[in-house]
Each structure stands twice: as structure tokens, then as C-alpha cells.
From Swiss-Prot:
Annotated keywords: Aminotransferase, Cytoplasm, Glutamine amidotransferase, Repeat, Transferase
Domain of life: Bacteria
Keyword Transferase in record: yes
Residues annotated as domain SIS: 286-426, 458-599
Species whose genome carries this gene: Salmonella paratyphi A (strain ATCC 9150 / SARB42)
Protein name stated in the entry: Glutamine--fructose-6-phosphate aminotransferase [isomerizing]
Gene: glmS
Domain (Glutamine amidotransferase type-2): residue spans on this chain: 2-218
Active site: 2 (nucleophile), 604 (for fru-6p isomerization activity)
Signal peptide bounds: none
Assembly and interaction partners: Homodimer.
């Protein structure tokens, strides 16, 4: 959601800012802008509704010269998508970009109007610009003005501020929205995501909650919200921006679906040794903590929530550990009873999901045994703030609709199940079966991907549909949830998922010839029950699309289309059956003509509530 890039250097920084914004496009946005100041304090600001490319074209027509600048991609919250609402926002000589939501912007706006300030946008960000301007008029430096302004803001923010009268300094403040400083030689940078800065530096400082940073070409000084100087460690990043080229694929999502066999191989690399799962990366004290676990609480949002739902079946049936999964935005606003020796597991592709982070922070006050993050971004807030962390190593995921991040999360979770089963002294065959299944998984998915053309033809049946129903049983029910989420995200077809046994409790009323019903049907102990549910749909004229194990005994008929899947080990079946549903959603979206990689109203990383 939104993106920030800032730079202060001796050279012109406009192209650095634009390239940074291009690398943040995957996060989702509706407008873009930048402001550059030269050594004499002359500021040029450009803003455009639409893509970064439109902003870049404007910059070609109106060349920008200056060594200090800030840039932003906006995902509308307060105020419609428009050029007037695009960042940066200006109050005389104060220029501001901001990610997050200022919850008390309305009373602040009224107070500032009473002081004579005029607002030209509908955004909460303009409040920050005028507030800093007002505080600066009361005396002191820009840093002192920011220190006085920040406590007046309620909500989440990551903001970068410059004063055109002093173009040798940038100020940044972070509370609930990530910011990272990039360190150069005689130049420094700041962004909301380190990906934006990889072309110019590999050295980073991640700001912590409440930090305020004063950045010049040759120095970075960081203060807490009382104004006391603090030290933050700089790190060398080995993160690769390896997804910038779609190659032979039409969309990043398609590319990332096809990358899943290799992504899972990367997830497994170095983590299986002598037939056992090796998670020694967790550190020397991890086994002591994990051996005490009597309950697992999982927090996540969106696709990550669905992966947590799958793992609940695994933790309970394979490791014998009770597990609860909760939507992070619900967990943080209710009073919960913490089970004894409960491990908090958080799931997030980006590691910056606002509600998940807030849930993690809350859990530290509630007496959990410890916390473990499963994440795709090293150095992210979730990773830094958790006791333990496991990286999915999926590589950069650009498409807003998650694919390889989901399957690699499940891969890590299944390895964790194996590890816990061993620590609990359970039968060694449990870990053996998990390891065997995971080692076979990449080749199984490659087999499945060979059916892409058949699924593409199937997708044509959905071209005129407005609704769809997904069904699954057991650990395939969360896969049905994920399939429905993918379809609605990128094709804009209203899709819902149900546990198949719930059909008679309401959803059966929806069944008619215009309601496609998608079913996942591996050959497991629930297959006969599932077949009964399928017959209930057939009897009412529903159009069935069944992704079934080749040995499940299904036969196609007029209103039941069988898509045979290769037989796979039961333990990896949820991961495997995810992939055809991803392909179905992708091809339906192509037929519908939607923006597959950046679907309307959605953002890749949800860094606000």
C-alpha cells in the first residue's frame, strides 16, 4: 500500500526517485508524485493520476534538477484518486509524503483552519504538512518542529518531510508504517521498502516504532519520540530484486504460478538433512522453547490466513498440538484467553501487514510462550519483532494476488509440524512421510502445470458468470477458501467457499444452472462424503467443476466436468490442489479483461488497518 522514496545527494535525484517508485508499483496505487529541490531551494513538484510511467513522461517534459527529493505512490484512503490528492503535499516551504492513516485528521484540520491554513486536498496527509509548518513558525529547527507535531497525530504513519529553505536535510518519522534508510557514499536515501533502494545501496537501517530520523548527505541521526538520540544497527542486505522481468509470461502472477516448483525447492534448501527437517537456523535455544509448546495461536490476514487454516489440520492431526487460527484484525480488538504454553505464529508475505504486526505486539503483553514469524522478507518488522523467524525464500512476489508466497508458507508450516512432532517424541513415520511428500512436491506441481491448457479452456465457461461456489472438506476446505479468494480478487466474480458438509445449511439454496460449483477432491478418507455432497449439487442442476484425484472414480457428465489430477501424497495434497485453482482464477481474469497483477482497489502489502 502506498510507497515512499526519498533521496539526498550531490547528483540529480529525480531518476532515483522514479526508479524507486517503479519498484514499488507492485504494492498497488492510484496516483504518483514527486518533488525535487535544488541547492538554492527551488522546488519542482509533479503529480499524476494513474501509473508511474505517466509521471516519468511528465518528468521528461519538465526536467527536474536537484539533489534532494521525495516521491510517493498513493493508494486512496481519505479523498478520491485525483491529482489534487496525490502526494507530495505542500504547506509553503514544507513538503510531505506519508503512508498510513491519521485518525484525528478532522479535528486537526479544523484547528489549522482556525489558524488561517487553507486546505486544497481531501487527504489526511495535508494536515501533517500544515501542522509541521505551524510548529516551525513557533520556533526551532525542522527536527524540533517535527518532534512537537508528531505527538499530536493519532494513527499510523510513515512520513518524510523536507523544508525547501534547507534542502540539505530530510526528516522522517515512523509509527506503525515501515521506513528504511539506505546508506550511500556521500548520499543517503529513505523508502517504505528496501526494494526501492537496491539500485543505489545494499546498506540499510530499519527505523523502529517511534523513531525520528534526520538525514543529510553525510549523516543519519536517529531520535526517539522524546528527542533523545538512539543508535540503530545498519545491515548489509542480500535481497534480490529478481522479479522485475516477466520474461515469457504475460503477467507477474502467471510467472509466479510457474515459479512455484523452484520456489518450493528454495524453501526446502538446507532444511532437510538425513531424512529429517533441519531448522537449526532458529538458533540454539529454539528447541527448548518449541518443546514446551502445548498450544499454537496463528494470526494472519487474507491469503496468509488461509494457509494458517490449512496448518491447523496439520498441527492437530500430525503433531497433536491444539491450534487456533484468527484473523489478525479481529484478534487485536477482543479480549482473549491465552492458553498455557501457547506459541504465537504470525504469517505475512511482506512482514509489514499492519493488523498482524499489531496482533504480534499485543501478544507480547498477554503472556504467550514466544512468537515465531513466517515471512518472505528478511529484515521486515514482523521478523525483527518476533522471537523466532522462518523465511519462505519464495523470491520477490510482484502480483497482488499471492501465489508462491502461499505455497511456500504452507511448505514452511509443514516442516514446522515435522519438527514439533519429533520434539514431542511422536512416531518417526510422521516426519518421514512429511519429508518424503515435501521432496516430491516440486515435481508434482510441475506435473500439474502441464494441464494449464485444459484449465484455460475450462475458464471459458466462466466468461458470463457473476457468482461461483467453492467446496472442500477437511484440510481442503481452506484451499476452497483460497480458490474463492483468488477468483474474486482478480476476475471480480463474487465467489464464496464452504465446507462441503455445510451445503444443506444454506448454500444449497443458491444452486442453479448459472452457479458454477468448483470442488477439490483428493482421494482421501473424506472422498465418499464429498461425493454425496456433489450429488446434492447435481440433483439441483448445478454446474460442477471437480478437480479430482485420477483414482477417485469420477466420470464426467453433462453438468459435471472432471479435471483429473495426478495422485499425490495426502500430506501435500492441500499445497498441490492450490495450483489448479490459481490457474483457473488467472485464466478467468484474462477472459474478463481485468488487470491481473494490480486488481482494482487492492494493494500488495496492507500497511494500514
Amino acid at each position: 500500500m502506498c510507497g515512499i522514496v526519498g533521496a539526498i545527494a550531490q547528483r540529480d535525484v529525480a531518476e532515483i526517485l522514479l526508479e524507486g517508485l517503479r519498484r514499488l508499483e507492485y504494492r498497488g496505487y492510484d496516483s504518483a508524485g514527486l518533488a525535487v529541490v535544488d541547492a538554492e531551494g527551488h522546488m519542482t513538484r509533479l503529480r499524476r493520476l494513474g501509473k508511474v510511467q505517466m509521471l516519468a513522461q511528465a518528468a521528461e517534459e519538465h526536467p527536474l534538477h536537484g539533489g534532494t527529493g521525495i516521491a510517493h505512490t498513493r493508494w486512496a484512503t481519505h479523498g478520491e484518486p485525483s491529482e489534487a490528492n496525490a502526494h507530495p503535499h505542500v504547506s509553503e516551504h514544507i513538503v510531505v509524503v506519508h503512508n498510513g492513516i491519521i485518525e484525528n485528521h478532522e479535528p486537526l484540520r479544523e484547528a489549522l483552519k482556525a489558524r488561517g491554513y487553507t486546505f486544497v486536498s481531501e487527504t489526511d496527509t495535508e494536515v501533517i504538512a500544515h501542522l509541521v509548518n505551524w510548529e516551525l513558525k513557533q520556533g526551532g529547527t525542522l527536527r524540533e518542529a517535527v518532534l512537537r507535531a508528531i505527538p499530536q497525530l493519532r494513527g499510523a504513519y510513515g512520513t518524510v518531510i523536507m523544508d525547501t529553505r534547507h534542502p540539505d536535510t530530510l526528516l522522517a518519522a515512523r509509527s506503525g508504517s515501515p521506513l528504511v534508510i539506505g546508506l550511500g557514499m556521500g548520499e543517503n536515501f529513505i523508502a517504505s521498502d528496501q526494494l526501492a533502494l537496491l539500485p543505489v545501496t545494499r546498506r540499510f537501517i530499519f527505523l523502529e516504532e517511534g523513531d525520528i530520523a534526520e538525514i543529510t548527505r553525510r549523516s543519519v541521526n536517529i531520535f526517539d519520540n522524546t528527542g533523545a538520540e538512539v543508535k540503530r544497527q545498519d545491515i548489509e542486505s542480500n535481497l534480490q530484486y529478481d522479479a522485475g522481468d516477466k520474461g515469457i509470461y504475460r503477467h507477474y502472477m502467471q510467472k509466479e504460478i510457474y515459479e512455484q516448483p523452484n520456489a518450493i525447492k528454495n524453501t526446502l534448501t538446507g532444511r532437510i538433512s538425513h531424512g529429517q527437517v533441519d531448522l537449526s537456523e532458529l538458533g540454539p535455544n529454539a528447541d527448548e522453547l518449541l518443546s514446551k509448546v502445548e498450544h499454537i495461536q496463528i494470526l494472519a490476514c487474507g491469503t496468509s490466513y488461509n494457509s494458517g487454516m490449512v496448518s491447523r489440520y496439520w498441527f492437530e492431526s500430525l503433531a497433536g498440538i491444539p491450534c487456533d487460527v484468527e484473523i489478525a484484525s479481529e484478534f487485536r480488538y477482543r479480549k482473549s484467553a491465552v492458553r498455557r504454553n501457547s506459541l504465537m505464529i504470525t504469517l505475512s508475505q511482506s512482514g509489514e501487514t499492519a493488523d498482524t504486526l499489531a496482533g504480534l505486539r499485543l501478544s507480547k503483553e498477554l503472556g504467550y510462550l514466544g512468537s515465531l514469524a513466517i515471512c518472505n522478507v528478511p529484515g521486515s518488522s514482523l521478523v525483527r519483532e518476533s522471537d523466532l523467524a522462518l523465511m519462505t525464500n519464495a523470491g520477490t512476489e510482484i502480483g497482488v494476488a499471492s501465489t508462491k508466497a502461499f505455497t511456500t508458507q504452507l511448505t514452511v508450516l509443514l516442516m514446522l509440524v515435522a519438527k514439533l512432532s519429533r520434539l514431542k517424541g511422536l512416531d518417526a513415520s510422521i516426519e518421514h512421510d512429511i519429508v518424503h511428500g515435501l521432496q516430491a512436491l516440486p515435481s508434482r506441481i510441475e506435473q500439474m502445470l502441464s494441464q494449464d491448457k485444459r484449465i484455460e479452456l475450462l475458464a471459458e465457461d466462466f466468461s458470463d458468470k457473476h457468482h461461483a461456489l467453492f467446496l472442500g472438506r477437511g484440510d481442503q476446505y481452506p484451499i476452497a477458501l483460497e480458490g474463492a479468494l483468488k477468483l474474486k480478487e482478480i476476475s471480480y466474480i463474487h465467489a464464496e467457499a464452504y465446507a462441503a458438509g455445510e451445503l444443506k445449511h444454506g448454500p444449497l439454496a443458491l444452486i442453479d444452472a448459472d452457479m458454477p460449483v468448483i470442488v477439490v477432491a483428493p482421494n482421501n478418507e473424506l472422498l465418499e462424503k464429498l461425493k454425496s455432497n456433489i450429488e446434492e449439487v447435481r440433483a439441483r442442476g448445478g454446474q460442477l467443476y471437480v478437480f479430482a484425484d485420477q483414482d477417485a472414480g469420477f466420470v464426467s457428465s453433462d453438468n459435471m466436468h472432471i479435471i483429473e489430477m495426478p495422485h499425490v501424497e495426502e500430506v501435500i495434497a492441500p499445497i498441490f490442489y492450490t495450483v489448479p485453482l490459481q490457474l483457473l482464477a488467472y485464466h478467468v481474469a484474462l477472459i474478463k479483461g481485468t488487470d491481473v497483477d494490480q486488481p482494482r482497489n487492492l494493494a500488495k502489502s496492507v500497511t494500514v488497518e
